[in-house]
Amino acid sequence: MTRKSDLSPIGVDAAASGETFEGGFPLTLGANRIKAVFAGNARELLGRASIAALAVFIVGAGLTCVAQLMIARIIGPDSYGVYAYVLAWVTLLGYLSTLGFHVSLLRFVPAYQAKGEWALARGVIQYSQRRIARTAFCIVLVGICGIAALRGSLRPELALSFLLGIATVPFLALHLIGASVARAFGGIIAALAPERIVRDGLALAIVATVFWGSLYRLDATLAMAATLLSSIAVLGLVRITVRRLRPPALGHVKPVYAAEDWWRPTLPLTVITIADNLMSRSAVIALGLTGNTRDAGIFAAAFSVATVTALPRMAVAISFAPTVSALFALGDRTGLQSVATKAAWLSLIGTACAAIPLLLLAHPLLAWFGRDFVAGAPIVTILVLGQVFAAACGPQQHLITMTGNERAGATILAVCASSSFAGCVLMIGSFGMTGAAFATTLTLVGWNVAMAIFIHRSLHLMPGVLAPFKAMPRRKRAADYGI
């Protein structure tokens, strides 16, 4: 879902001066120029922005794989399983703390900028930051109380890892909000780099330093402590980025609040956020809950390798969401169809290029994590096939949420996420990790099919790569009649 979107485009002062951001596309565009930009160059901008985002994703993915590989080898498969299990919960709670604002900001801020409503843009940013901070700290308090109550039944390593993980939640949530604001202001590289490069790079540096200096025991608590420190650093960098990218017009107005309008789509987005994270982490959480933390670590490593094939789709989505928001606000349905089709093809081509070598090299890649992790090779194959199918459908979730259909999107995703978790729990008992992989992939396929049906029926758009083929007969008939 994404939570990661960004072609952004909208301001006043930079438009007059012709200022551009990294990659060559406008940092900000005046409200009077946005129609021309999206009417004539949406696909070109989408492609250029997607390439820039993909470059960051590739570098970040490589660093993430190296970081996870080194951490797994340093702390071992058992402790890595504990770390992966705790990290899955921390990520889930971090996204829950955003209350869906990290997605809705990508809809509201570009729309307000397109209309020159700077007071509302400033208002929604301030409002979301305050609500998220309060929610995250409440989750921390509840989490600490829960861990204290269950401490007697938890292994010391698991209990301490959870405490460190819970402390990470506020920093993760505030970083997600800050990154969304930066992307809405036009920062693709600047918003993605801290999360994709700095966080994992710093975490790896901390773990490696402790390892070589023999400064602390090598277990899951070390990895979680490194995650906490790197999350704090990333939040600081994102705040600096937002301050640098903020349009000057935003600083000269008093914030105006429209909380009721903001909560209406945000509540469904909260459901989407929880469901999306649950679906992607259901296997690791299910394995951990059943006491199979070692298998959870192996599955997490396999999932991390397979996720490389999702990078092109994520990169396209980065540029897709604000573009859809602006086109929908302008009532440009033709532009929506054009950009949606372009996004699907970019996603599929990029995913296919990543999937083929990954399927061939899954075994040796996992061997780098350690001998125990080779058991995850079949899991990589199953998960990659699901990612290829999802890529052919394009970033459909963004198309649904950015056109005001959050409730429908939330319902579809919630049903699929629940099915994914239930399927993992049921399949693990009989087929272990492989069963969890099948449940995850089948749910991903079902989710994309359900979204495609909704988009076709409700938005009257053809989703995925089949759109141009569906339109061919109609165009031919029109040409035959001289239309």
Where are these regions (language model features)?
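Interhelical loop/hinge segments that connect adjacent transmembrane helices in multipass membrane
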Residues: 14, 26-46, 216-226, 234-280, ...
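Membrane-interface junctions at transmembrane-helix termini in multi-pass inner-membrane proteins
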Residues: 172-197, 384-413
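Transmembrane helical elements of multi-pass membrane transporters/channels
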Residues: 49-65, 198-199, 223-246, 253-322, ...
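Membrane-water interface segments that mark the loop-to-transmembrane alpha-helix transition
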Residues: 11, 18-29, 48-60, 86, ...
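Signature of the first transmembrane helix
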Residues: 19-32, 44-103, 140-144, 168, ...
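Interfacial segments at transmembrane-helix termini and the short loops linking adjacent helices
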Residues: 38, 42-47, 148-165, 293-294, ...
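Helix-loop junctions and terminal segments of transmembrane helices
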Residues: 99-115, 184, 302-331, 337-340, ...
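Hydrophobic alpha-helical transmembrane segments
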Residues: 163, 193-246, 415-419, 433-457
